[in-house]
């Protein structure tokens, strides 16, 4: 439910600043090709205290593992072990990771295991999208949630006990070539595409390292001439990523989360002259039951029939907002807060202003 406090909180915390500050290149752009790679694998968690899986594939996986160790069970045997869980294991392989380095691993239950707390992940190969093994994972799980149940069926769950982590549980076995040391240029890709930011980035690099060092190919990418010797290229990029650049001011936007009622209004949002009337309709639904009782000795049966009553009422007085030409977001928020409206009211008002053409901003609903 939306409240007046959340509107005020939105006005205080969720307003973008109109002032642009210089930022480092490393905060504005990424180096093309220098990125993490996602890895995934399938494994088993053992040592659970009766909170494991009750699925056929967990049984099958356990039997397959036992067969690899020379323990052959008769066909059709079911282990029915409640201390084992089938899990998906995934991790991010950072750029430039070398063989032998450790990475963190996340483990998620695939079946109906109640909790992974106290479990140990057995050796699991982690593969990339190309099917090659890039890391091996194994270790004791750290689980933030818990699950407890009583003999009478009562149960309590805190957070998510079916997901855990193994810090440093993955060992890199194979490196990924980033192509960082190839070619005569380095490509910088802006995190937020903007022609002004790209131009300012080119100008800042050329001012620092000489004219013609950098040039923009579009609103997102900037090519920088760089030395080919790896040591020199690393030092060169170290200089570039610490150059300060003034980013361009983003276009006027209003972002609305229709599920939570969160509204973010950009600092450049303005409204043309407009008047808005907004009122709330309250729909009330009441359910009751009518009982039809036959007369004494009539031989009939008592009948119970549902009865529904619907009513539509207007809650509160109509709200009138009058905005002069060029009004800013401060005026909008103050006007809505003054009448004690909720974020839901503000959403409806902004949508109506956009439809009328009075709102000079992009309205984005997420």
From Swiss-Prot:
Its main location: periplasm. Disulfide bonds: none annotated. InterPro entries: Flag_FlgI. It is found in: Periplasm; Bacterial flagellum basal body. Keywords: Bacterial flagellum, Periplasm, Signal. One of its GO terms (biological process) is bacterial-type flagellum-dependent cell motility. Residues 1-22 form the signal peptide. One of its GO terms (molecular function) is structural molecule activity. GO terms for cellular component: bacterial-type flagellum basal body, distal rod, P ring; outer membrane-bounded periplasmic space. The basal body constitutes a major portion of the flagellar organelle and consists of four rings (L,P,S, and M) mounted on a central rod. PANTHER family: FLAGELLAR P-RING PERIPLASMIC PROTEIN FLGI, FLAGELLAR P-RING PROTEIN. Assembles around the rod to form the L-ring and probably protects the motor/basal body from shearing forces during rotation. Belongs to the FlgI family. This is Flagellar P-ring protein. It comes from Hydrogenovibrio crunogenus (strain DSM 25203 / XCL-2). The gene is flgI.
